[in-house]
From Swiss-Prot:
Coiled-coil ranges (or none): none
Biased composition regions of type Basic and acidic residues, renumbered to the chain: 155-164
Organism of provenance: Felis catus (Cat)
UniProt protein name: Testin
GO cellular component, one term: plasma membrane
Length: 421
């Protein structure tokens, strides 16, 4: 398929999850409706991951595509119908007998993802070392956490041009080259092992305290208990605390055989979140999630959340923007050359600010223009004018004067306050 055909085929999947309730806004949101180029709901401005959208198949397709043409093809399977790679995530089901007064019942726990190791006891131990609220048990807070992190850490629009908004053929080609490069140079999947198993791993290397390396000659010099003691000295590359013998650890091949992590320490160095499904990107001695690795390589548009492959883009408020996406967050009008106000780190045009966000003057009860001076006390504001900031009793101008605030009213003296009480 040529580039022109790829561009024509692009879409954002606007029907997916349509009408799903927002878990954050509840009844305030009319239901999920994807904005035509932002990755948010048009109704409540929350992301798709904040809505009750069933994404398991879509997420499995996304991760499957990420692993395509990599050494991790054992983690994917291609559907017979369309050849689309699907992520073969490992689901773990545990059954625990529960003693009751008269009989024994079976309690079943399903983990929506578990490390793909043959030893289920090791996988179970790995899960127990994660914070409870981050264990991906089906129907739990942890499962919801995993769902959000899949969306946040591995955006589909960071690897698939068809998920982006109106890329040019040149941008499509650049993105494909970028994805190919990070797959070959940075992408990896953690492996759960017992620390002692690392003694036999690597090209004539063994792990010593503090992550130092020792050659086989040094190993050969060790004898008896001394050698065994040395082999049990492992420290976490993240927290630097020791690894307990028998506890599972995570090994990242791109980081090298001299580095191990506690399960709860295998996190992105930028956002400090657990690396979802142990999928990592390695750069300059640090672990990253997909999003923050890409952020370290390319500018990201604060409007559409996509990486910028164009040579021309704008910078405003310490953020990057496609030229066509530096728009009002409320009405989508382009802001180039226009007055705007930042509201929760989002640019809003002056008319929308006055209509939707401006504070109301306690004096005249009109919205206060963003360019006009105002007086603010607690949650109350006034135009800083002789017509508005007045004593609520005698109408004396209070600009530059002492005043007594009482529930949205202001007084110039105790006497005026008593007269209004």
């Amino acid at each position: 398929m040529d580039l022109e055909a790829k561009v024509k085929k692009m879409g954002l999947g606007h029907e997916q999850g349509f009408g799903a309730p927002c878990l954050k806004c509840k009844e305030k949101c009319e239901g999920f409706e994807l904005h035509f180029w932002r990755k948010i709901c048009r109704n409540c401005k929350c992301g798709q991951e904040e809505h009750d959208v069933l994404l398991s198949n879509e997420e499995d397709r996304k991760v499957g595509k990420l692993f395509e043409d990599t050494k991790y093809t054992t983690l994917i399977a291609k559907l017979k119908t369309d050849g689309i790679p699907m992520y073969k995530r490992n689901v773990m089901i545990l059954t625990n007998p529960v003693a009751a007064k008269k009989n024994v019942s079976i309690n079943t726990v399903t983990y929506e993802w578990a490390p793909p190791v043959q030893n289920q006891a090791l996988a179970r131990q790995y899960m127990q070392m994660l914070p409870k609220e981050k264990q991906p048990v089906a129907g739990s807070e942890g499962a919801q956490y995993r769902k959000k992190q899949l969306a946040k850490q591995l955006p589909a629009h960071d690897q698939d041009p068809s998920k982006c908004h109106e890329l040019s053929p040149k941008e499509v080609k650049e993105m494909e080259q970028f994805v190919k490069k990070y797959k070959s140079e940075a992408l990896g999947v953690g492996d759960v092992k017992l620390p002692r198993e690392m003694d036999t791993q690597g090209p004539n290397r063994m792990l010593l305290p503090g992550g130092d390396r020792s050659t086989t000659a040094a190993v050969g010099a060790m004898e008896g208990k001394s050698a065994e003691h040395k082999r049990t000295q492992y420290s976490c590359y993240c927290c630097k605390l020791s690894m307990k013998e028998g506890d599972p650890a995570i090994y990242a091949e791109r980081a090298g055989y001299d580095k191990l992590w506690h399960p709860a320490c295998f996190v992105c160095s930028a956002c400090q979140e657990l690396l979802v499904d142990m999928i990592y990107f390695w750069k300059n001695g640090k672990l990253y999630c997909g999003r923050h690795y890409c952020d370290s390589e390319k500018p990201r548009c604060a409007g559409c959340d996509e990486l910028i492959f164009s040579n021309e883009y704008t910078q405003a408020e310490n953020q990057n923007w496609h030229l066509k996406h530096f728009c009002c967050f409320d009405c989508d009008n382009i802001l180039a050359g226009e007055i705007y106000v930042m509201v929760n780190d989002k640019p809003v045009c002056k008319p929308c600010y006055v209509k939707n966000h401006a504070v109301v003057c306690q004096g005249c009860h009109n919205a206060i223009d963003p360019e006009v001076q105002r007086v603010t006390y607690n949650n109350f504001s006034w135009h800083a004018s002789t017509e508005c900031f007045l004593c609520s009793c005698c109408s004396k101008c209070l600009i530059g004067q002492k005043f007594m605030p009482v529930e949205g009213m202001v007084f110039c003296s105790v006497e005026c306050k008593k007269m209004m009480s």
